[in-house]
Amino acid sequence: MYAVVTRSCRWWSYALIAALLVPACTGNADGGSSSPDGPSSAAADAPRARSPLRDRPLPEPVPYRDAPEGITLADPAFEPLPGADAHFGRLGGAVYQIEIPHAWNGGLVMWMHGFGELGPEATVAPPDFRRYLVAHGYAWAASSYSSTSLIPQRGADETAALWDHFAREHGRPDWTYASGLSMGGWSSHIAAERYGDRYDGALALCGAAGTVPGLRVSAEYLVAGAYVAGVTQAELDASDDVGRLVEERILPALDDPGTRERFDRIMVDLTGGPRAFAVEGIHDEEDTNFARATLLAAARLAPPRDAPYRLGPDSPVTSEEFDREAVVLPTGDGYDEFSAGMEVTGDLAMPLITLHTTGDGQVPINQAQILRDRVEAAGRSDRLVQRVVEDPGHCGFSTAEQEAAFQALVDWVEHGDRPEGTNLAVDDLTDLDRTFEDHPRVTSESDGVVTLRGRARLDGEPLDARWMGAVVRHDGLVTPCNVTLPPSDNGRFELGVYADEASAGCGRRGSDVLLWTYAGDQRLFATAPVPWPAAGAASVEVEFSTSDPLGAAPAITEFSGEVYDDAGHRREAGGRVEAYVSTTLCGVASIRGSEIYVIGVAGPDSIPGCTAGGPVRFVVDGDEAGESGTNAPEQSTHLDLTVPAP
């Protein structure tokens, strides 16, 4: 009924670790292909030169696993974009997807997805900027990997094995670029060091700087929480259930405003220092990181402390005192085996551009600084350019920001035009260059967002859920309006909701907010609405019932996707999307900063004239879209929209 639409990486945030590495072996490949009718929607960029690697013999194939590791593999079949061919199949223990434009320019992007949450099934995730690649003549290829564990090294290796398959089947590309998001960004760092015989350059999006930095983030949430809650090393060592210690000692302590402020200030310093959206990002990822730290401690896989803690002048404690009193999480014999091959040394074999956000609470900005230091120590600074955008989210880049970074990499590799970057060798991160943002972000403290925080219960018990979201109801229209998708932990939650001035159709005076969550695979809505608060924040109590999944929500049809003009250019964030059944306005929304629209189409019970089963037409900033849908209440449809070019 209401689809969850967000940056793909946010789905990888809530589980952690564990299958240890197993020996690799060479496997077999099988696959298929498909192609739609019709010409390419945009002319491909003509290749201007060929990589020096192009005329070399193919390197020795990278070994890969014969079978998936404790998981099943999803069907990789997919529909290509107009003007492209789809190739898909299985390569040993993983499945893959390849998309090649009819007017291929000889360029290839090897895409690496993020952490699979230890899910039961491995799937392929295409790049967010897939349309841009195909429109500009680039092919792309992506692997599911043979595991859904935290395996950045295997992601890099199995993607390189897919490159071998591509080169055998389709010929060696003129240019190849490695890229990935979240754990895939970490994999991109590894690939940029390991596969200079295959790739010409790399674009790493929100990737960790290596094993210890990557795992230390979650551990430090627990360390800082224990410190402000007064949990001692002896208490931690005596506990046989770190999760209970978090639930009963640390989280209740953080409900106190003074303790919360001390925790926030320590965490800001541990993750890079004061900067835009630092606190918002820490709050967004708090439950995820406490859960990960609990698993690290239970599995004795916490990274070793490799340096003293360093806190800034704004922290409520000195570095020396915190270093002396901070608890140490256990590291067991399995750590070395688990982390083998994950490290990033900085010895780059190719140009690398990295992209980070200031508020990322999973891969904080200090990961970019650590990477920079390692690259400098390896004598490879001439091969690194880093960019930062101010955003509160993990991998919270717009697609346009990713596209711009990719084009900068191409210009650097193929034409020698080294791009500009963000200077991170500074003590003050509060005034970074904002050149690389394509739109300003709203904050939970702005007029465009309200914050709902409080307690949630499911069938009378405190709610534990991976996601909570919100829709806003106003004059019969219902619009998805959550800023992020935070979890609920033991009934505690904090959720940002857009106001109408930030996203069309969202909250204003007279609106109701309907919160939602999941219980297993069942979508549940709160049994009562929350009135739109008069101020920027409100404390609320909400109830969900498995016997009444719709709760107080009306039945709507939901559509989501991206908006392009007929020249292949993406419409910018902020555009207004309207949905009509005949001449009746039945839905309104904005194109979000991520270039995604999510719109609810009301049914006849909410607005007369919004006929169930009727055709739905879409208008974007006054322009009629070429696509249409059907008003089918309680259904969700992905639908990209195309409007006339200006």
Predicted segments with their positions:
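C-terminal motif of bacterial Sec signal peptides marking the signal peptidase cleavage site
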Residues: 22-24
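Catalytic-loop region of hydrolases
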Residues: 27-120, 126-128, 288, 331-332, ...
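Accessory cap/linker subdomain of secreted extracellular hydrolases
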Residues: 47-82, 208-343
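Gly/Ser-rich "nucleophile elbow"/oxyanion-hole loop immediately N-terminal to the catalytic nucleophile
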Residues: 103-104, 161-182, 196-198
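Short beta-strand/loop motif that positions the catalytic acidic residue
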Residues: 354-356
